[in-house]
A protein has these predicted regions:
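Short, small-residue alpha-helix embedded
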Residues: 25, 81-112
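A structural preference for long, well-packed, hydrophobic secondary-structure segments
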Residues: 3-9, 77, 97-98, 111
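Charged C-terminal helix
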Residues: 115-143
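Short, charged, surface-exposed loops that flank catalytic or proteolytic processing sites
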Residues: 32-37, 99-107, 125-126
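Glycine-rich phosphate/dinucleotide-binding loop and adjoining beta-alpha-beta core of small-molecule
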Residues: 1-73
Length: 143
């Protein structure tokens, strides 16, 4: 099990990017609440633990330590491909390393993530190799 008390040891709010299964392992006591009231639960957890949370499910729910919540309701089953969450984390980290704020980094990364995912969806892909997804990052605006 994940020891959530470690979240209090960071000097800046950490960014977590769990899908719902990982969420259950991280925040088991909140899982039932999440199933009933996603937005409210994300808001509560982000405030309580001083974190950014990107909950990946059919939709994406982004929560901030300041209790802001953004829902991206643009389902794309192709974005659940193994490894795609790692790409999202890498994109976020890349933006942060360039000096963008956490929320700017998250939103920029999700924009790229969804643009590439939607390219695959619109072109009737049923799957893709994660390396092909990575290759598209350098020209995502042209997709």
């Amino acid at each position: 099990n994940f020891d959530i008390s470690i979240l209090n040891e960071f000097s800046k709010p950490p960014i977590l990017t769990p899908h719902t299964g990982e969420f259950k392992r991280f925040f088991g006591n909140y899982y039932d609440s999440l199933c009933k009231k996603k937005v409210l639960t994300v808001r509560e957890i982000c405030k309580k633990f001083n974190i950014y949370l990107i909950l990946k499910d059919v939709d994406i729910i982004i929560g901030t330590p300041k209790e802001e919540v953004i829902v991206i309701d643009n389902p794309n089953r192709l974005l659940s491909t193994a490894g795609s969450g790692d790409i999202l984390c890498g994109l976020i980290t890349g933006f942060i390393s360039q000096g963008f704020s956490e929320i700017e980094s998250i939103l920029n990364a999700i924009k790229i993530f969804y643009t590439i995912g939607n390219f695959y969806l619109k072109n009737n892909y049923i799957s893709y190799r994660i390396t092909d997804f990575i290759d598209k990052i350098s020209y995502w605006e042209d997709l």
